[in-house]
């Protein structure tokens, strides 16, 4: 299960209702921030999420609307005397920009809190403990952009009727079987896990894509996702402008979701030039299970 809190859902120009991009993903006791636009620290407080156990930031790219909140967040964490190491993941070019930004404020190699930088590469898999994050390249203007696949493992559960019929008693033996190890019961019979485990269920797949100028080549990462979070900065009537600025239209995002058997489509990176109803209508005509994210929306997948 992944719990998402949308902290910022605007395009490059924020509005009174929408902050610069940031998304909090929580799973298996971990809390991961995707992008950190200006004002993200206040959005964390306003959402009720706060700063606790926040130790990893994934950056889609280094355009300023996605990274300017990092210095303010770090300054506040430093004032709170946080000793936790913050790991920032991003493409090499993205990290170079962030490192130079921090150096301009606090000096080379310095920051208010301990920081580690981890460069992303195509095909890299981050083991977050309880789930994985696959990283894949995305095309957006002159940046080294990345998208992310959050995957929780499907699990097989013990079948009570089978345990009872085979005479497996309550206790440690059942725990061994649940871990996939055969056991020998009191009468000498060996019980194999395959005899008492049901089919794998419960795995979840969440895909988050930030700014992107095309969905070409991305189907292999998005196919069969339970949820796709992706930008929809323009309407289809302005597709030529979308190309000029390296963004998608709502229709393109919806067609991409429909072609890849996505469960739910969540659109973000909203431009103030359109009404939400226009954007949603364009997407829903193609992919009915679409919604537009608003700041402080909380969605569980």
Curated annotation (Swiss-Prot):
Binding site for Zn(2+) 2: 65-66, 211, 269
Pfam families: Lactamase_B_2 (PF12706)
GO MF annotation terms: 3'-tRNA processing endoribonuclease activity; zinc ion binding
Protein name: Ribonuclease Z
Record's keyword terms, sorted: Endonuclease, Hydrolase, Metal-binding, Nuclease, tRNA processing, Zinc
Obligatory cofactor(s): Zn(2+)
Function: Zinc phosphodiesterase, which displays some tRNA 3'-processing endonuclease activity. Probably involved in tRNA maturation, by removing a 3'-trailer from precursor tRNA.
Co-factor note (free text): Binds 2 Zn(2+) ions.
Family according to the record: Belongs to the RNase Z family.
Enzyme class: hydrolase
Catalytic activity: Endonucleolytic cleavage of RNA, removing extra 3' nucleotides from tRNA precursor, generating 3' termini of tRNAs. A 3'-hydroxy group is left at the tRNA terminus and a 5'-phosphoryl group is left at the trailer molecule
Gene3D superfamilies membership: Ribonuclease Z/Hydroxyacylglutathione hydrolase-like (3.60.15.10)
SUBUNIT field: Homodimer.
Binding site for Zn(2+) 1: 61, 63, 140, 211
InterPro entries per record: Metallo-B-lactamas, RibonucZ/Hydroxyglut_hydro, RNase_Z/BN
EC number: 3.1.26.11
